[in-house]
From Swiss-Prot:
Transmembrane segments: none annotated. SMART domains: KH (SM00322). Residues 212-234 are annotated as: Disordered. It comes from Alkaliphilus metalliredigens (strain QYMF). Gene3D superfamilies: 3.30.300.20, Ribosomal protein S3, C-terminal domain. HAMAP family: Ribosomal_uS3_B (MF_01309_B). Belongs to the universal ribosomal protein uS3 family. This is Small ribosomal subunit protein uS3.
Length: 234
C-alpha cells in the first residue's frame, strides 16, 4: 500500500499536519475549498521562480485568511522594502474579497525538499539536460544535504524516444510502508519539445518518534489505570 498512495496523505494525522487549517460547516465548506485551490494556484503561478515548497492556509471566524508561503528565496517574494509581499496581499484580497495576511517562511535546506527537487529536475529537462544526469545530480545534492534516502522517477518520452517509458533511481533507504518515517513527496512536469515528462521524488528525512514528555505521560496514565483496576479487584 505504501508504494501506491501519496506518502503525505497516508501520514496526515499520524506524523504530518494538514496544509489547510480551518473548519467550516456544510454550507461554506465547498466555497472555502475552491477558494483554497484558487489561492494556491495563483500564488504558485505568480511566485514560481521563487521556489515555492508549500502553501498553508488558515481561516479565522472574522473573515480573515492567513497564508503561509514556504519558499527557498524569501527575498524574491518579499521584494525591496516589502513591496512584493504587499502587492501579493492586495491581489489576493481583490480575488477573495477577504482580509488576507501573507506570512513568508524560509526553507532552510531546499536540497531535501522533494517538491523543489522535482521542479529543479523539470527545469533542467526543459533546458535539454540529460534526464539521467539531472536525476543523479539532484540525488547527490540531497544526500550531501543530509537526506537518509531518495528515490526519483521520470516518465514520458525520455531522450526523445518514440515510445514512452518510466525510469527511476534510488539511493539510501526510503521506507514507504513505515508510518513513523518522515517521507517527503513531490511531483512536477517538464514541458519538452517531445511532450510532457512527469517527475516524482520521494525523500526520507528520518523517523519522527513521540517526545520523551509524551511517553512519560502515557506511562504515568497506564500506571494509574492499572492501580485503579487493582483497587477495584480488591
Amino acid at each position: 500500500m505504501g508504494q501506491k498512495v501519496n506518502p503525505h496523505g497516508l501520514r496526515v494525522g499520524v506524523i504530518k499536519d494538514w496544509d489547510a487549517k480551518w473548519y467550516a460547516n456544510k454550507r461554506d465548506f465547498s466555497d472555502y475549498l475552491i477558494e483554497d485551490h484558487s489561492i494556491r494556484k495563483f500564488v504558485k503561478k505568480k511566485l514560481f521562480l521563487s521556489g515555492i515548497n508549500k502553501i498553508e492556509t488558515e481561516r479565522a471566524a472574522n473573515n480573515r485568511v492567513k497564508i503561509n508561503v514556504h519558499t527557498a528565496k524569501p527575498g524574491m517574494v518579499i521584494g525591496k522594502g516589502g513591496i512584493g509581499v504587499e502587492e501579493l496581499r492586495k491581489e489576493l484580497e481583490k480575488m477573495t474579497k477577504k482580509t488576507v495576511i501573507v506570512n513568508v517562511v524560509e526553507v532552510k535546506r531546499p536540497e531535501v525538499e522533494s517538491q523543489l527537487v522535482a521542479e529543479n529536475i523539470a527545469f533542467s529537462l526543459e533546458r535539454r539536460v540529460s534526464f539521467r544526469r539531472a536525476m543523479k545530480q539532484a540525488m547527490q545534492r540531497a544526500m550531501r544535504a543530509g537526506a537518509k534516502g531518495i528515490k526519483v522517477s521520470t516518465a514520458g518520452r525520455l531522450g526523445g524516444a518514440d515510445m514512452a517509458r518510466t525510469e527511476g533511481y534510488s539511493e539510501g533507504n526510503v521506507p514507504l510502508h513505515t508510518l513513523r518515517a518522515d517521507i517527503d513527496y513531490g511531483f512536477a512536469e517538464a514541458d519538452t519539445t517531445y511532450g510532457k515528462l512527469g517527475i516524482k521524488v520521494w525523500i526520507y528525512k528520518g523517523e519522527i518518534l513521540p517526545t520523551k514528555g509524551k511517553n512519560e505521560e502515557t506511562n504515568n496514565e497506564t500506571a494509574d489505570n492499572s492501580r485503579g483496576r487493582r483497587r477495584e479487584a480488591k
